[in-house]
UniProtKB/Swiss-Prot annotation:
Domain notes: The PDZ domain-binding motif is involved in the interaction with PATJ, CASK, APBA1, DLG1 and DLG4.
CDD domains: 7tmA_5-HT2A (cd15304)
Record gene name: HTR2A
Membrane-spanning parts: 81-97, 112-137, 147-171, 192-215, 233-258, 322-347, 356-381
Role according to the record: G-protein coupled receptor for 5-hydroxytryptamine (serotonin). Also functions as a receptor for various drugs and psychoactive substances, including mescaline, psilocybin, 1-(2,5-dimethoxy-4-iodophenyl)-2-aminopropane (DOI) and lysergic acid diethylamide (LSD). Ligand binding causes a conformation change that triggers signaling via guanine nucleotide-binding proteins (G proteins) and modulates the activity of downstream effectors.
Sequence motif DRY motif, location on chain: 172-174
Listed name of the protein: 5-hydroxytryptamine receptor 2A
Keywords from the named record: Behavior, Cell membrane, Cell projection, Cytoplasmic vesicle, Disulfide bond, G-protein coupled receptor, Glycoprotein, Membrane, Phosphoprotein, Receptor, Synapse, Transducer, Transmembrane, Transmembrane helix
Membrane topology category: Multi-pass membrane protein
Feature type site, description Hydrophobic barrier that decreases the speed of ligand binding and dissociation: L229
Amino acid sequence: MDILCEENTSLSSTTNSLMQLHADTRLYSTDFNSGEGNTSNAFNWTVDSENRTNLSCEGCLSPPCFSLLHLQEKNWSALLTAVVIILTIAGNILVIMAVSLEKKLQNATNYFLMSLAIADMLLGFLVMPVSTLTILYGYRWPLPSKLCAVWIYLDVLFSTASIMHLCAISLDRYVAIQNPIHHSRFNSRTKAFLKIIAVWTISVGISMPIPVFGLQDDSKVFKEGSCLLADENFVLIGSFVAFFIPLTIMVITYFLTIKSLQKEATLCVSDPGTRTKLASFSFLPQSSLSSEKLFQRSIHREPGSYGRRTMQSISNEQKACKVLGIVFFLFVVMWCPFFITNIMAVICKESCNRDVIEALLNVFVWIGYLSSAVNPLVYTLFNKTYRSAFSRYIQCQYKENKKPLQLILVNTIPALAYKSSQLQMGPKKNSKKDDKTTDNDCTMVALGKEHPEDAPADSSNTVNEKVSCV
């Protein structure tokens, strides 16, 4: 009898447990599945409880429901990052196509911009998608551990290449302003590519220690299951070598370039001593040369206090510096928060809130990635050649419809009878016209200056200066 009573008691307790479990299940379904409003209230109440008591979520919100809500929040972040990835890849592909196909854009500075676009495009292809994947997995590394060091290496490589390209552009423009003749003589396409190779070599050298040491010791690239640089020495040294030092060089040379342009503009306005003699004219038949080389003129300048550059060429340089300055500014503004926070994470480990630092780094790194997507937008807004090329490429028109060449001469030579095929005019000996100079500002491309936007680029080392004196 005692045994039967114990069995009945056990069965009744089991029945009561099942009934209580059923009631709890119904309560759970009512609280979290009855509507959007109840879910929000339960979640807000949980957050308030955590803030008031600083306790875990046990008893107030079940872990499956919390994970579902948290995953939904991260999906919105992943959606935003997907938009950034698409803009980065598509925009930089357009930049690469424009420099490759448009002769007007084929000069040293735009070659650097094309190489920069390649780095940004590879960042969008190889680095950003993996970063989005880690967001979906709660910043845990979901791929094989050996790929972590490779991913960080590519991230550092392309980010370093971006700042190195901007630094090289700033240095190249400054040299072109300070010594235009020397820069024009030694600034060929081959030398521009050699400079680009040097930039990539430096970037590879800075980022190479990551896979070398990371593949040997996982602790240098893993921290609590997350794939990130855990070596504090490399974080400090890498931040200064890969960002702050090139940033300092870039900013100094850019402001020196602006100062030099302002100084030359002042000299050109105050001193009309740019004495330019028209030595010879040459009109060649269109069948023998391309339209870009149809009209050539040799120009000889007399030495004066200011004879290197005219107001139009200085104005073109200032426009180019304006566009580059916007690119520099956006890059600095978008990457500085990440690198400053990265340094703070190492320096103030004990005094700073670790969770806050990690959250800021996760946000700031994507703000830095965003700089790779905005460069094509800057080119589109401020450069009509890029804007026209992008518009045609989107419409699958890869060649520009060339308009027939119309040659107009205004007040440059006296009216003479000449053949339509060829006219040559040279200076006469002991003629007063030999001493006649052009004091007006003539629109010309000075030695060492990049081609303006609406002038076709010439790959030859000979400088054919265009003149339009009105």
